[in-house]
Amino acid sequence: MTNLIIFLFPIRKKSQRFEFKGYKLNAVTKNWQSYDNLYRMTCRALKSRIQDFDVKELSGGFFSAVYLIEADERKVILKIGPNRDVRIMRHELEYIPTEAEMLHKLRNIDILIPKLITLDDSGEICNEPYFFMSFIEGTPLSETEVTGYELDAIKYQVGRITRQICSNPAPYFAVPGLPASITTRNSRFVLTLVKWLLDDAAEKQISIPFIKPTELLNFIDSYSHTLDEAIPCYAHTDTWDGNLLIKDGKLNGLIDFAAILYADPLMSHDFHDFNAKPLDSFLRGYGKTSFTENEMIRIQIYRIWQRLGMIVERGYRCYDDSNIYAWVLDKFVKEVKKMKALGYINRLL
């Protein structure tokens, strides 16, 4: 048992952070609007005829067009879904309505998140759904220099927030807004997520390194009993450094709630991010500092799912920089090798 734990979670002293400084992440999914449209959308949302109006495209984010809007001295954020003619991944089909719904549902939780102002899916001004939310001051952690002490405090807070989100039970496992994903079994849900990614990859002829799709699905299916130990809750699967807003060295806000799933709490991002193991500071904040063997197996499966998603995403976004986060290919292979070794170890036990 000890060897298995060391194999899955080797010790690493420092947080491994991936930064995107200097990038303007322009993707085909970003549905930029004209100045006139933005003005009309804002007047409708704020229910006033605005006199002083200014807009700024925000360069962060990997999916939606996002604007910082100043309207008569009020700052708000506008987020717009992709044009319907743009092909997006299966799990992304309801991203904008889902994020608006999650902001509304989580509004009474004591965490630092934007407040939903309005969702408009009428198509009367903009051809796709969009929503306005409150502005939170701060710079993404991915673009901020912090001390080791500050980073520990930030990740501790992320752990506390993650626990608060996960404390909300979900009625079933699902991608919110996508009925085809609904199931009462976590194993069926995880297989659906992975199969959707593999189908998305096949349709765009995106190569998945080192492992055949059927082999990956069969391996995950072989751990159905382990996956099915999970109980569904709200799980934020994208609390990476780019979604953490920092002010004066402290966490001042968490953004991007489109990636909340009804899922295993261990599917929350910081359990399976790019560190060799979950950070101690995060785990202390979450209130869980040890794992059973089955929990570690589930985390390992989620590490592969998360990296697979990034590989497929690169082929759908068509970023200006075609090599952006190409490093994830090697990370995926590394996790698959761990998975294969894990299967071999278990056959010997």
What are the residue ranges of the model-derived segments?
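Hydrophobic/aromatic-rich alpha-helical bundle segments in the mid-to-C-terminal region
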Residues: 315-330
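Active-site Asp-x-Gly
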Residues: 229-235, 240-300
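ATP-binding pocket architecture of kinase catalytic cores
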Residues: 56-188
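Hydrophobic alpha-helical segments that form the core
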Residues: 300-312
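Polybasic, lysine-rich low-complexity intrinsically disordered segments
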Residues: 13-14
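Phosphate/pyrophosphate-binding loops and the adjoining catalytic core of nucleotide-dependent enzymes
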Residues: 8, 18-27, 343-349
